[in-house]
């Protein structure tokens, strides 16, 4: 009985090695943070819209248009 369990354990470890498990650095959240540190433009990533900076003298900040955020302060 014990030898059968040993064989089963060995076969399972050979078919599914522990190195196949994802590491902390492979998590999608970490990859997003790395991508955000790069210079991202909306031309490269259409789903990413860069926040416009439209502060100036006499302008109110932040600005909204039809309840949509359009720009923030510097």
From Swiss-Prot:
Taxonomic path: Eukaryota, Metazoa, Spiralia, Lophotrochozoa, Mollusca
Function: The short synthetic peptide SIIID (range 54-74, with disulfide pairing 1-4, 2-5 and 3-6) reversibly inhibits human alpha-7/CHRNA7 acetylcholine receptor (IC(50)=880 nM). Shows a paralytic effect in fish.
Name this polypeptide is given: Conotoxin SIIID
Source organism per UniProt: Conus striatus (Striated cone)
Cell compartment(s), UniProt: Secreted
Tissue-specificity statement: Expressed by the venom duct.
Tree of life domain: Eukaryota
Alphabetical UniProt keywords: Acetylcholine receptor inhibiting toxin, Cleavage on pair of basic residues, Disulfide bond, Neurotoxin, Postsynaptic neurotoxin, Secreted, Signal, Toxin
GO cellular component, one term: host cell postsynaptic membrane
Entry GO MF terms: acetylcholine receptor inhibitor activity; ion channel inhibitor activity; toxin activity
Disulfide links within the chain: 54-71, 55-73, 61-74
Name of one Pfam family that matches: Conotoxin
Family, as annotated: Belongs to the conotoxin M superfamily.
Prosegment location in residue numbers: 21-53
Residues making up the signal peptide according to the UniProt record: 1-20
Note: Negative results: SIIID with the disulfide pairing 1-4;2-5;3-6 shows no or very activity on sodium, potassium and calcium currents in rat DRG neurons. It does not show obvious effect on the human alpha-3-beta 4/CHRNA3-CHRNB4 nicotinic acetylcholine receptor.
Modification comment: Three disulfide isomers have been synthesized and tested. SIIID with the disulfide pairing 1-4;2-5;3-6 is the most active.
This protein's domain notes: The cysteine framework is III (CC-C-C-CC). Classified in the M-1 branch, since 1 residue stands between the fourth and the fifth cysteine residues.
């Amino acid at each position: 009985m014990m030898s059968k369990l040993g064989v089963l354990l060995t076969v399972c470890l050979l078919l599914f090695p522990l190195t196949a498990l994802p590491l902390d650095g492979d998590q999608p959240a970490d990859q997003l943070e790395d991508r955000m540190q790069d210079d991202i433009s909306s031309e490269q990533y259409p789903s990413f819209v860069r926040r416009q900076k439209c502060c100036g003298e006499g302008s109110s900040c932040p600005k909204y248009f039809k309840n949509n955020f359009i720009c923030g302060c510097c």
